[in-house]
């Protein structure tokens, strides 16, 4: 039976595989996928007596670098901290400007404010969740120190286009610090919170941008409960070990030795090079990540199966689904974004509420930054970002995770058909 046929069977209440599929289910939006392997790894950390930053964190960094085909990873307690430390490592601060997308979560933009710089928001391209590459070039000034593109839903941005756009205005680039002088254009610091394991044009996420941050929050594909990391491509002239040491200093008060280094006999002496921050990852978090990373290829494969099942089952509804896979790219399959074509915000909101009544938790990704109080207070007006508003107005995110069975996905598909038909019959537009 085809996916569409299965969805129709669900809607009619027929039995499939001996189970009544029209019985109301509870489909959570994005629960963590925790197996015995994660429990054992965390228990091992607890038994070891070493629970803060230590050997498991360092191993996790090495394993992430191997997985992503990069030279180095630096782990933090969040992707937000990773982004902030990346900006600080470039010397970005007051008086500087950093461009990012208007269509993202606040964590892409708040680090710009944290370092004292000014966020410059860019609209997305028409009908796209990606930053408008042509508009980026027009926003670059002599104050621009970095661009933060966002890999929404795990789909990597077109970094070739972004680089070309920045190279077209390289005459405005004014490097000030030794690290900035390694670039002949504005550096790209990617928000890859969603895109660990994604590939585009033959490059893994982490290799396409100059710097890439990742999130391991509880709802991400790979979780450490809370956590994040930063990696970077091999940049001619960049001393990766020096950069790593600087990032570690930033993450631990500027202290020259972490707790693990101080355990060596006679190694108690330390210095504080500058007043840094406190955003290090712990071994308990890393232990969870180590087990998750070993399972990650299988988790990515399962996500792809679910995405493709959605694509088949929703093909006859006016849902514009984000494209996760193509001839030269594969996303991490993080979020199932769907735009209900021709629908209003009223219809979208009613759709989410009705799906909730059927036991299916849905969400919206994202409310554009200019609609949020904090960014309104900075002077941003949603009228200046019409494409972001259009993407948001009829977007709904369906459950997508590795705890979903085939029957669960078929149930969601069936309920999408039922709820869409119900609202349309009521005249909701």
What are the residue ranges of the model-derived segments?
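Phosphate-binding glycine-rich loop
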Residues: 50-97, 111-113, 121-122, 170-174
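Hydrophobic/aromatic ligand-binding patch that stacks against planar heteroaromatic rings
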Residues: 110-112, 204, 284
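PLP-dependent aminotransferase class I/II
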Residues: 58-62, 70-71, 146-150, 155, ...
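Conserved active-site segment immediately N-terminal to the catalytic lysine
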Residues: 176-223, 268-272, 321
């Amino acid at each position: 039976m085809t996916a569409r046929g299965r969805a129709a069977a669900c809607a009619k209440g027929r039995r499939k595989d001996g189970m009544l599929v029209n019985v109301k289910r509870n489909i959570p939006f994005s629960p963590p996928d925790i197996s015995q392997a994660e429990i054992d790894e965390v228990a091992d950390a607890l038994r070891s007596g070493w629970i803060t930053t230590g050997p498991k964190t360092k191993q996790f960094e090495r394993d992430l670098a191997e997985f992503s085909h990069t030279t180095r990873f630096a782990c933090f307690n969040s992707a937000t901290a990773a982004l902030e430390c990346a900006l600080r490592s470039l010397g970005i601060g007051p008086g500087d400007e950093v461009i990012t997308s208007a269509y993202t979560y606040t964590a892409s933009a708040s680090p710009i404010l944290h370092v004292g710089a000014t966020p410059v928001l860019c609209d997305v391209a028409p009908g796209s969740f990606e930053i408008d590459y042509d508009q980026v070039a027009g926003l670059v000034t002599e104050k621009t120190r970095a661009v933060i593109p966002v890999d929404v839903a795990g789909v990597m941005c077109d970094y070739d286009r972004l680089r070309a756009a920045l190279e077209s205005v390289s005459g405005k680039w004014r490097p000030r610090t030794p690290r900035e002088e390694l670039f002949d254009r504005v550096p790209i610091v990617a928000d890859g919170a969603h895109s660990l394991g994604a590939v585009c044009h033959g490059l893994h996420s982490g290799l396409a941008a100059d710097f890439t941050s990742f999130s391991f929050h509880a709802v991400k594909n790979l979780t450490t409960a809370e956590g994040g990391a930063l990696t970077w491509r091999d940049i001619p002239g960049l001393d990766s070990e020096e950069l790593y040491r600087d990032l570690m200093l930033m993450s631990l008060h500027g202290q020259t030795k972490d707790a693990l280094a101080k355990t060596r006999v006679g190694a108690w002496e330390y210095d504080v090079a500058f007043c840094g921050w406190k955003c290090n990852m712990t071994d308990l978090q890393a232990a969870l990540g180590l087990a998750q990373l070993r399972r990650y290829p299988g988790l990515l494969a399962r996500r792809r199966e679910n995405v493709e099942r959605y694509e088949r089952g929703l093909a006859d509804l006016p849902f514009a689904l984000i494209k996760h896979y193509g001839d030269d790219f594969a996303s991490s399959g993080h979020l199932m974004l769907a735009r209900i074509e021709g629908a209003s915000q009223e219809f979208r909101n009613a759709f989410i509420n009705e799906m909730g009544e059927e036991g299916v938790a849905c969400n919206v990704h994202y409310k554009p930054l200019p609609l949020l109080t904090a960014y309104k207070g900075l002077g941003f007006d949603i009228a200046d970002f019409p494409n972001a508003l259009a993407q948001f107005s009829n977007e709904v995110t369906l459950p997508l995770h590795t705890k979903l069975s085939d029957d669960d996905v078929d149930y969601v598909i069936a309920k999408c058909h039922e709820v869409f038909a119900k609202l349309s019959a009521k005249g909701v537009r």
